[in-house]
Amino acid sequence: MSEVALPAPAASTSPEKPSAGKKAKKPAKAAAAAKKKPAGPSVSELIVQAVSSSKERSGVSLAALKKALAAAGYDVEKNNSRIKLGLKSLVGKGTLVQTKGTGASGSFKLNKKVASVDAKPTATKVATKTKVTSASKKPKKASGAAAAKKSVKTPKKARKSVLTKKSSKSPKKPKAVKPKKVAKSPAKAKAVKPKGAKVKVTKPKTAAKPKKAAPKKK
């Protein structure tokens, strides 16, 4: 009898399952990392705020600090070790001064020198920003004012040139008129003198008339 070929077994889908498992693990790690990162200010910042808000001259005790942190919504019971580490680091940096006790136990105050140094750079930054903004604004106004002054000065120069032209033209007219009048007056005087001379010449003719009556004798 002839042998019948059996159908090949279907390919198993088992290798795909581990990949899905790996993909599922990655979001779990991301969620854990998101949980580890606390939202809001750090423990040291909360401690500094609590110490600065207190009005006690001798300093704030650890119990008072925990109460202030709990009132701010911080979980004191779970983060007790973090509070102690934050206090030690702040004392080591010099931001806090330990007035009583040793380590994390005792009372703490803000270091005034460090607080003043921290406040000065912020004030200087604000002052420099205001100076830069004012300096950037002033040149624009000055340039506009300078342009306006130049535009105002140019017509003055034009007016001055017009006035100088008018003043230079006006004296020429009387100078041209005066010599003409002076020239006419001597001409009239010269014309009068020869008339008088003609009268003197005609006088001897009247003296010769009696000679005609002399030769008549009876």
Curated annotation (Swiss-Prot):
Assembly with partners or alone: Interacts with DFFB.
Molecular function via GO: double-stranded DNA binding; heparin binding; nucleosomal DNA binding; structural constituent of chromatin
Residue numbers of N6-(beta-hydroxybutyryl)lysine PTMs: 37, 55, 67, 88, 93, 109
Name of this protein: Histone H1.1
Gene Ontology cellular component terms for the protein in this record: cell surface; euchromatin; nucleoplasm; nucleosome; nucleus; vesicle
Residues modified to Phosphoserine: 2, 12, 44, 107
InterPro entries linked to this entry: H1/H5 (IPR005819), Histone_H1/H5_H15 (IPR005818), WH-like_DNA-bd_sf (IPR036388), WH_DNA-bd_sf (IPR036390)
Modification sites for Phosphothreonine: 206
Entry's family note: Belongs to the histone H1/H5 family.
Post-translational modifications reported in the UniProt record: H1 histones are progressively phosphorylated during the cell cycle, becoming maximally phosphorylated during late G2 phase and M phase, and being dephosphorylated sharply thereafter. Citrullination at Arg-57 (H1R54ci) by PADI4 takes place within the DNA-binding site of H1 and results in its displacement from chromatin and global chromatin decondensation, thereby promoting pluripotency and stem cell maintenance.
Annotated region described as Disordered, given as residue ranges: 1-42, 116-218
Location in the cell: Nucleus; Chromosome
Protein's organism: Bos taurus
Coiled-coil portions: none
Domain spans labelled H15: 39-112
Biased composition (Low complexity): 119-149
N6-acetyllysine modified-residue sites: 17, 78, 93, 125
Keywords tagged on the record: Acetylation, Chromosome, Citrullination, DNA-binding, Hydroxylation, Nucleus, Phosphoprotein
Entry remark concerning the domains of this protein: The C-terminal domain is required for high-affinity binding to chromatin.
Location, primary (coarse class): nucleus
Stored SUPFAM superfamilies: Winged helix' DNA-binding domain
Gene from which this protein is expressed: H1-1
PTM-bearing positions, type N-acetylserine: 2
Alphabetized SMART domains for the sequence: H15
Pfam families (UniProt xref): Linker_histone
Record's function text: H1 histones bind to linker DNA between nucleosomes forming the macromolecular structure known as the chromatin fiber. H1 histones are necessary for the condensation of nucleosome chains into higher-order structured fibers. Also acts as a regulator of individual gene transcription through chromatin remodeling.
KW rRNA processing (keyword) present: no
